[in-house]
């Protein structure tokens, strides 16, 4: 019997509720699986600022480093504003300190019964299935910058974006690895702005070199980021496969993609520090949605967090059977109409969590 250690950092507002449901599901899996989970709870974001004065306490970071994976709820809220110390700084710092260089965001439909919820026509989005692989610890978000008040005349501000061949190489290898998990391998789309930006030209050249020398069996196509943004609205399935792009472009394009399934409450994400080639890469898992400070208690959709746990089971905890069962359980629950208000349902957060926990326990028990 193996024990997997998970550092839980709920963060702010709905973060605690969604993490509670994720833990509920993992405890249900424990009942019918040889794997056991140990949970270590720590602070991040606004909750950490209130308690310690900093958005990422040292003890949180050390706990994360000594665990098999990290489960994050959500950070931020108007209470903490945009001052010098902000909740989001904790998220950026933990990504950097843990070297979580690859962010994976799937965009698909857990169930075809959700197609009608998309803001796009069902016939346009049906069959959409891609994963955005976003470089997460480089680029403009981590480049040198100058605030307006720091300039000599108080009339300018700037940020810099920089990528090295090494940084582009490792994110390309991650995209290739994800593509090779399928038979036949998935196509790869590399998004850049090579017609304007020098770093995009380095990006494109490096991607081509890595793909041609290390993964000649894979198909890679380059697409300008603005063109890809249009395709995503007009015909999203055209980008099916694996999308690889830089930090800022990935942030924007994955947020655009997040509205396709109809609710941010459906979309999981993983941030990895290495290739999951042994299904045991260290990673941080979180829903794509924010902290929803205006949402009443017990109303948030926990599905994105629960599906993030499924990714954790597959990529970090080497629990492939449990991951598949959990994804199947989520589909069954949604098909049964047990949904929160964002999916035109009337169920509460806890009711959805209870239903998924019961479903995954039953699926695993029947599979013994």
UniProtKB/Swiss-Prot annotation:
Pathway: Amino-acid biosynthesis; L-leucine biosynthesis; L-leucine from 3-methyl-2-oxobutanoate: step 3/4. GO terms for cellular component: cytosol. The keyword Lyase does not apply. The record marks 141, 193 as: Important for catalysis. Belongs to the isocitrate and isopropylmalate dehydrogenases family. Catalyzes the oxidation of 3-carboxy-2-hydroxy-4-methylpentanoate (3-isopropylmalate) to 3-carboxy-4-methyl-2-oxopentanoate. The product decarboxylates to 4-methyl-2 oxopentanoate. This is 3-isopropylmalate dehydrogenase. The gene is LEU2.
């Amino acid at each position: 019997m193996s024990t997997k250690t998970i550092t839980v950092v709920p963060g702010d507002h709905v973060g605690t509720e969604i993490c509670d449901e994720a833990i509920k599901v993992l405890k249900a899996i424990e009942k019918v699986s040889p794997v056991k989970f140990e949970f270590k709870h720590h602070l991040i974001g606004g909750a950490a600022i209130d308690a310690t004065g900093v958005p990422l306490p040292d003890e949180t970071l050390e706990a994360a480093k000594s665990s098999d994976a990290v489960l994050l709820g959500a950070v931020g809220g108007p209470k903490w504003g945009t001052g010098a110390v902000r909740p989001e700084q904790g998220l950026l710092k933990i990504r950097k300190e843990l070297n979580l260089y690859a962010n994976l965001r799937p965009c698909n439909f857990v169930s075809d019964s959700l197609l009608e919820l998309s803001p796009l026509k069902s016939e346009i989005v049906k069959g959409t299935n891609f994963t955005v692989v976003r470089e997460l610890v480089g680029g403009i978000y981590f480049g040198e910058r100058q605030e307006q008040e720091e300039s000599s005349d108080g009339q300018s501000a700037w940020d810099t974006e920089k990528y090295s061949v090494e940084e582009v190489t490792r994110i390309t290898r991650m995209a290739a690895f994800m593509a090779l998990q399928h038979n036949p391998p998935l196509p790869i789309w590399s998004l850049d702005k090579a017609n304007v930006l020098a770093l995009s030209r380095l990006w494109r050249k490096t991607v081509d070199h890595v793909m041609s020398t290390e993964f000649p069996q894979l198909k890679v196509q380059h697409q300008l980021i603005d063109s890809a943004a249009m395709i995503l609205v007009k015909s999203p399935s055209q980008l099916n496969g694996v999308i690889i792009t830089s930090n800022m472009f990935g942030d924007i394009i994955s947020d655009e993609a997040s509205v396709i399934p109809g609710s941010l409450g459906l979309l999981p994400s993983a941030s990895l520090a290495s290739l999951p080639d042994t299904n045991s890469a260290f990673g941080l898992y979180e829903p794509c949605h924010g902290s929803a400070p205006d949402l009443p208690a017990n109303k948030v959709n926990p599905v994105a967090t629960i599906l993030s746990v499924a990714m954790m089971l597959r990529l970090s905890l080497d629990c492939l059977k449990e991951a598949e069962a959990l994804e199947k359980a989520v589909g069954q629950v949604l098909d049964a109409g047990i949904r929160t208000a964002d999916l035109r349902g009337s169920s509460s957060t806890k009711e959805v969590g209870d239903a998924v926990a019961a479903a995954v326990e039953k699926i695993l028990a029947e599979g013994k």
